[in-house]
Design a protein with these regions (language model features):
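His-Asp phosphorelay/catalytic-motif detector in bacterial-type signaling
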Residues: 45-47, 73-79
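C-terminal output helix
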Residues: 108-117
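Active-site beta3 strand of CheY-like receiver
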Residues: 44-50, 55
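Short, conserved "switch-loop" micro-motifs in signal-transduction and mechanochemical regulators
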Residues: 72, 86-87
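Alpha4 helix (beta4-alpha4-beta5 surface) of REC/receiver domains from two-component response regulators
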Residues: 18, 60-64, 87-102, 115
Length: 124
């Protein structure tokens, strides 16, 4: 069974993404901040991580979590897709520079998200 990690500080967003992906045969994990994301990714090694960039109040935001995961040989191969309300070119570039493989701006199309997940899962 393929594994997906959803990372967002807002429980509503995590639940929305999970409901969107329930059509597939996936094992879904969630984390509410970057530190938890790194811990879960190291323990479970998901096939894809869907991660928010901004997580106010968190010691580790999505960009820093992405950097940590991509610099760790044990997790560097995990595909990371950023999900963010920040959609400026500079935000997208910051995500790419941190190591993100793709970037979706919120609100995102559920169909596009499903297609991206299926593409990544199919490649792994």
């Amino acid at each position: 069974m393929k594994k997906i990690l959803i990372v967002d500080d807002q429980v509503e967003v995590r639940e929305l993404v999970q409901v969107t992906l329930e059509i597939g045969d996936y094992q879904i994990f969630s984390a509410e901040n970057g530190r938890q994301a790194v811990d879960v990714a190291r323990a479970e090694h998901p096939d894809i991580i869907l991660m928010d960039i901004m997580m106010p109040g968190s010691e580790v935001d999505g960009l820093e979590a992405c950097r940590r995961l991509k610099s760790d040989p044990a997790t560097a191969d995990i595909t990371i897709v950023m999900l963010s309300a920040k959609g400026q070119e500079s935000d997208i570039m910051a995500g790419r520079e941190a190591g993100a493989n793709d970037y979706f701006t919120k609100p995102f199309s559920p169909i596009a998200l499903i297609e991206k997940v299926e593409q990544v899962i199919g490649e792994n």
